[in-house]
Amino acid sequence: VIDSTGQVVAEAVLGDGIEHVATTPAGQTWVGYFDEGVFGNHGWGDPDLDGPEPVGVSGLVRFDERLQRTWEYPDTAGFGDIYDCYALNVTGESAWACFYDGFPVVRIADDAVSGWTNKASGVRAVVTDGLRCALVGGYGADRDRVVTGLLTDRGRLDVRCTTRLALPGGPAATGRYTVTGRGDVLHVLTGTAHLRLDLDQLFT
């Protein structure tokens, strides 16, 4: 971690197989891991090499400002284990995630986990204001899919619309691009362009 003057203020190994990194106003760092970070690679978790347990074995870990682990996704959360953290959205001090293989939407607030089931798979970005939610991405032909809905008190996503992500220059998103959610804003990176869509736009 480097401060505004360029000085290194913290340094640590956060593990292998890092998929997402996001920080909070209080200086916390959330890290989501893909499968190699969960199950081990390059010696991590290898019993033949007496390798250490992967840092990301839980799939989602929070570190403090000194990069010490303060929380990790529990296997008792009730929404399945994280085999690959496909999407991570950090807003304030809370985090939202969507992960393989069941792709529930989960929220971590004050260390408590709540979640909502849905039928989408391959989700690459979660965009939410806490009541509404958009799930962006999918497998194959659904890579530009956008599923919007309401997060109900029954623990499931009440889908309102399924549409496609459209980028400038064409009716549908084509080519290589990256999507990520931050609060109620979807960020799209394509080439040298950085595009933003808020939740109101995704719901129209």
Identify the role of each PLM range.
Residues 106-170:
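Intrinsically disordered, low-complexity segments enriched in Gly and acidic/Ser/Thr residues
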Residues 27-39, 87-100, 106, 126-149, ...:
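Short beta-strand elements that form the blades of beta-propeller/WD-repeat-like
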